[in-house]
Amino acid sequence: MDVTEVPWRRLPQFSVSSRASWLVSSGFPLSSYMFSHVERGKTFRLTLCFGVSRLRPRSAIPLRFLLSVFSEQPPSRLKGLCEVVWIVEADLAANEHLYVTGDPSTLGSWEPDCAISMYPTENDNEWEAKVKIASGVNFRYNYLLKAGYGSSSDVIWRPGPQFSLSVPSSVNQDRKIIIRDSWMSMSISSKSQESYGWGSWIDDAYLFPNCVTPAQSEDECTSADSAIEVPRTHLNDKQVGAESFLCDELAAFSSENSNLSALFSDNYQPIEEPWLIQESITLQHERNMQTDSEQDVESCDDNENNLNTDEQNHQLTETLLPDGGFFQSESIATTILINSSICTVQRIAVLEGGKLVELLLEPVKTNVQCDSVYLGVITKFVPHMGGAFVNIGSARHSFMDIKSNREPFIFPPFCDGSKKQAADGSPILSMNDIPAPHEIEHASYDFEASSLLDIDSNDPGESFHDDDDEHENDEYHVSDHLAGLVNGTVVNHGAVEVGSENGHIPMERGHSADSLDSNASVAKASKVMSSKDNKWIQVRKGTKIIVQVVKEGLGTKGPTLTAYPKLRSRFWVLLTRCKRIGVSKKISGVERTRLKVIAKTLQPQGFGLTVRTVAAGHSLEELQKDLDGLLLTWKNITDEAKSAALAADEGVEGAIPALLHRAMGQTLSVVQDYFNDKVEKMVVDSPRTYHEVTHYLQDMAPDLCNRVELHDKGIPLFDLYEIEEEIEGILSKRVPLSNGGSLVIEQTEALVSIDVNGGHGMFGQGNSQEKAILEVNLAAARQIAREIRLRDIGGIIVVDFIDMADESNKRLVYEEVKKAVERDRSLVKVSELSRHGLMEITRKRVRPSVTFMISEPCSCCHATGRVEALETTFSKIEQEICRQLAKMEKRGDLENPKSWPRFILRVDSHMSSFLTTGKRTRLAILSSSLKVWILLKVARHFTRGTFEVKPFMDEKTVNERQHQVAISLLKKADAIADSSGKKKLTLIPIKKEKTSGKQRR
């Protein structure tokens, strides 16, 4: 009989809240399956077999979840214990034993010593374990393999993913849950077949989205070699029927990951969607499990009934897709507030659920902005830093990283004979030969599945530049482009002339060359590297080059540049000197495949493309129009660069450095990245900004214009939403938590440290103490993600959580942080907690933090947070007086106080109070101890810790010094008169008489 295959999709409740591979009971029809995971050396093989009838290939359905399939619901039920039986087919050695381990509350412990042993059954290579578990619980479990007996046994294999099982709340008396797994090796000979493992946890394949509906009852799982009859059930309000069937043939699916080089350890577990299999699951169909390598993996039989069945399944798959073709994240009410300013700083606040989560500040007059493109001049090469300094017109020269295997955009450009090189470095097109948007040829949409898999899976050649990570937190799975390829065609670069002048850049940072000394000269390094490898061979000091700002200057550091600009629009990211195709990981299923094909079709020669999340669901015409705008922008950039370079060669002053393309302002950037269908409204308080935003949306997203509101009330916008106080609290080091704990945030030059304090949230003993610590750490995890996003903290962040004894609690805290940072636009990476409770978080920094922009270093403490103690300043005053006494020729008679030296001491008000308080003041003690007279004066402009010590001079001494100065001036005047031959000018010093308070009229 025909087998009705139900397409699936991932439900929200099975999101990345756990790293487990979920094993959930299901009530919808599914073919018999056999799941195999076999280790051979350093390679894991994953095999899934579906029952197929009529000996025809079926549509490739990926394994998103391991399913426990149950039969129809029994009439009688009761609550209590349910027996769960694990039956595993495994080919083990004589001294090897299989165990089951799981959650401590259900299966005892995750530790190998406390694992539940599985015993061999009557059948060969079959192991069984029985456990009674309370009804209505959900628990995780896993398998492990031990070699040996007793205390001498060693764990030789422990897979990474953890499975999950939901036990129904009501249990039939004579029923039990049976879980069948097969770990038998299967040899499949196919050149075209690829093998994938659990080394990658992100889905990126030609896969249909799957749907799993939890079962409403507890029933027995089906075996891989038995026929079952499953009742009709509902999937997302769609009724799907099935008939009993007999398994006629097994179609094998396999996948592998070449990067998997080691077994999983206890500390290393999949961190993101571990139940997904990377890349495509290729369908293999032949009776003897052998496939011709030249056979199309998506070929189908000519049987019309079979084709109709596949088409129905495909239509149902598309119907079950979420809106937009990609997985929707948890919906949170988002509001964007824009507080405009004419002469100071424009403020943009992002509210999620009524709470301030992000604050963006943009000074009205900004010289350098991130993503702006300049024509700069190379001023100095720094081979030991792997880059060069470039003058782009800013106060400090900017650092540019160099990739020696990627050709830059320089003027004059590289030449190969009489041909100009294209944007990707091939001698095909000149700068003026970049295809216009309307000249792009569009390929046919007739494609095969195998070609889809090869769109972005070329052999990895050159690695992309370091700023490949997206600022809007769109993660991309794209393959490295192959050096020397133009959209898959091999071209000959030809010989590149080697320059004879100094200043050639030797190699990119991190390039390994054992024959080169680290202190070798640039010329020597250039000789070692071949011209084919070093595409910067003609670049030298004074070369004009197109660069883009990837990170704004911070403190004493100048901006960071890249020689390979990257232009962004609403739907695309255009990558220069690249041939890669990428799609946001937030898009999956059929929509992901469609966008891949469109991107490959529209890809301009010599450029790479990345599809952004917002592009999901948009038509080809909309995507092409958006890409045409990017190509036109790049053409304008190259034209401006050529004009500026020619003007500089003709001696025009100020021609370079030149701004070629100004980055989009903060306002429109937020509209582009944030403003979508999930945003409830955007409120602006300036008619000028309102017109700017609506004018931009008229072309990009007209349907969102009605969500833009103009605030014209008397109360300020931020006061209306009560966020001014939260902005004031950004400078505070201590952040209180809702449960009584607190965070202490310390920002240094190297990193940011965050300390979690328990405070009043700590109470109880034993288990209650551990529970209280967990609650504080979980609350801190959520607040930390909010604070680093709100303060725009970048770089390395080290979090010191309260120590926890339970490893599972550490896992919960780690998962909470991972979940909390998902909504951050910047790229955030989180490490697991260490033995000492430390977590390392890295966040991409593209601009100065909010704290840096709204504050400046303290003139007293110099940004250290501490000022000099008054006792220390008092000691310094004593040392300074002693230093000046040592320089004096006459120190006076110690027995005659009138002859003691006199000094004037100027201090701040705090130090003055410190010296003059008490019965016997510190000033008197200092004077009598050093045998000096001290005249104390308060300088109001002095900061704390500042003082000045000068010798005191009476009026007679001052007059004598003034007389000496006057005599020296007379001598200079006489000398000048003698040399010039003019009349002598005599200067007579006149002593000014004191005048009375009343002036005569």
Swiss-Prot record:
Phenotype upon loss of function: Reduced photosynthetic activity and retarded growth. Increased number and decreased size of chloroplasts. Loss of autotrophic growth. Pale cotyledons when grown on sucrose-complemented medium.
GO biological process: one example: chloroplast mRNA processing
Key word DNA damage present: no
One annotated Gene Ontology cellular component of this protein: chloroplast stroma
Binding site for Mg(2+): D755, D800
Domain CBM20: 76-185
Assigned EC number: 3.1.26.-
Name of the protein described by the UniProt record: Ribonuclease E/G-like protein, chloroplastic
Species assigned in the record: Arabidopsis thaliana
Gene that this sequence comes from: RNE
